């Protein structure tokens, strides 16, 4: 399914990007907000609150992308990670090149996050990092509760890896 998710992402990237920038315009004073923290820490809740407080800001969220894949059902979330990550890259490339302000709701579990911050700084974005911390037991319990309510499964190994790597990469 990973190859299918990548193929789907590549063939539909324009539609996904259009949804990200819908209603927004490039900004004279560009803002880049990077979210970090483990699954279940509350990143999306903080990002959503920021989006509501700020005007003219694009939200880039792999979870939103993943939910729009035709075969996605929540329990198979890891099968769509590659495609969703590719859409994050496409969207980030686009907003950086065109000068849109944005919130990037991801973890810093991969080293590419540092590169993305550097890219924003080089393009004169006012750049902020929000690190949302939650006790790992509480975050894991929230992740399991979210799986029941939303159907989105996060494998325990991925949770542990994201928790450790997001802290190390920040």
Stretches with model-predicted labels:
Residues 23-30, 95-96:
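Phosphate-binding P-loop
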Residues 83-131:
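Glycine-rich phosphate-binding loop used to anchor ATP phosphates in small-molecule kinases
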Residues 50-100:
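Conserved substrate/cofactor phosphate-moiety recognition/catalytic segment
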Residues 1-25:
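N-terminal pre-Walker A segment at the start of P-loop NTPase domains
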Residues 38-39:
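The conserved Walker
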Residues 43:
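Conserved lysine of the Walker
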Residues 46:
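Hydrophobic positions on the alpha1 helix immediately C-terminal to the Walker A/P-loop
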Residues 141-170:
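Conserved GTP-binding G-domain of TRAFAC-class P-loop NTPases and closely related GTPase folds
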């Amino acid at each position: 399914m990973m190859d299918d998710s990548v193929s789907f992402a590549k063939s539909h990237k324009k539609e996904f990007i259009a949804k990200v920038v819908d209603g927004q315009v490039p900004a004279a004073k560009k803002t880049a907000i990077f979210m970090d923290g483990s699954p279940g820490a509350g990143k999306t809740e903080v990002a959503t609150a920021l989006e509501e407080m700020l005007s003219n800001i694009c939200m880039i969220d792999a979870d939103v992308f993943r939910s729009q894949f035709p075969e996605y059902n929540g329990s198979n979330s890891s099968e769509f990670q590659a495609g969703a990550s590719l859409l994050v890259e496409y969207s980030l490339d686009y907003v950086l090149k065109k000068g849109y302000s944005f919130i990037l709701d991801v973890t810093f579990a991969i080293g590419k996050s540092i590169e993305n911050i550097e890219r924003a700084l080089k393009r004169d974005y006012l750049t902020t990092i929000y690190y949302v911390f939650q006790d790992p037991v509480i975050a894991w319990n929230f992740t399991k509760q979210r799986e029941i309510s939303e159907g989105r499964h996060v494998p325990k190994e991925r949770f542990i890896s994201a928790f450790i790597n997001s802290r190390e990469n920040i």
